[in-house]
Amino acid sequence: MPRKPRFYLPDVPVHVVQRGHSQEAVFYEEADYRAYLDWLEEAAERYDCAVHSYVLMTKHIHILATPSARDGVSRMMQYIGRRYVPYINDTHGSSGTLWEGRYKASLIQEE
């Protein structure tokens, strides 16, 4: 059965959560956080997503972003994942998936 397509709207904020596979760490040292943030900055600029805030925890991440285009958040997260996962696997001698499935995303409504 195919996955449900994600639903985003341009200029509507999105809360993104991505967790480590089997509740494992996704950041091991300071350089890992820096690498992730560098790619987040590149991706946000490339796909025109305004990143309002983020929290990088040892085992998961939170990002609050507003995309200008409908596919901005998806493209941003794909860009980061295609760089960060191989970086972790190469740097720390691991292999396979880093994340627990797809990231979760929720539209943020105004009151």
Regions found by a protein language model. Name each.
Residues 1-111:
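Short catalytic/metal-binding and nucleic-acid-binding patches
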